[in-house]
């Protein structure tokens, strides 16, 4: 059974920072690309960042230069370092597998990030 468990969400003031974590199990983490996506209140899912199995990273324009995705294959853990947070970064953040023939796209339960003064 594929399981993704996010943590690290919190209430933070604008300009603050957070690090989200996602512990994966039930599949070969090191062989799969991973993503962070987010959902604003009342909105659809928005892609945030991807990291390939080899460690290449890709970012949405809205977070480029402020967020950093990384992975620790020894710990089966995905990270999202978030700096200079803005009110518009408020959302539920989900980690997700890269979906392909071998493993469909799975999501975690999400962790809530609220940016407010």
From Swiss-Prot:
GO biological process terms on file: immunoglobulin mediated immune response
Record bears the keyword Repeat: no
Domain Ig-like positions: 1-116
Superkingdom of the source species: Eukaryota
GO-annotated molecular function: antigen binding
UniProt xrefs under Pfam families: V-set (PF07686)
Signal peptide positions (record): none
One Gene Ontology cellular component: extracellular region
InterPro entries in the cross-refs: Ig-like_dom, Ig-like_dom_sf, Ig-like_fold, Ig_sub, Ig_V-set, IgHV
PROSITE patterns: IG_LIKE (PS50835)
Annotated keywords: Adaptive immunity, Immunity, Immunoglobulin
PANTHER family: IMMUNOGLOBULIN HEAVY CHAIN
Further details from the record: This mu chain was isolated from a myeloma protein.
Name of the protein described by the UniProt record: Ig heavy chain V region MOO
Organism: Canis lupus familiaris (Dog)
């Amino acid at each position: 059974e594929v399981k993704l468990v996010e943590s690290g969400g919190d209430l933070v003031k604008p300009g603050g920072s957070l690090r989200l974590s996602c512990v994966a199990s039930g599949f070969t983490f090191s062989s799969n690309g991973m993503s962070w996506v987010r959902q604003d209140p009342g909105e659809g899912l928005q892609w945030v960042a991807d990291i390939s199995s080899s460690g290449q990273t890709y970012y949405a324009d809205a977070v480029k230069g402020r967020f950093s995705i990384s992975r620790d294959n020894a710990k089966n853990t995905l990270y999202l370092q978030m700096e200079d947070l803005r009110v518009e970064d408020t959302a539920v953040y989900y980690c997700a597998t890269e979906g392909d023939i071998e493993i469909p796209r799975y999501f975690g339960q999400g962790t809530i990030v609220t940016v407010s003064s």
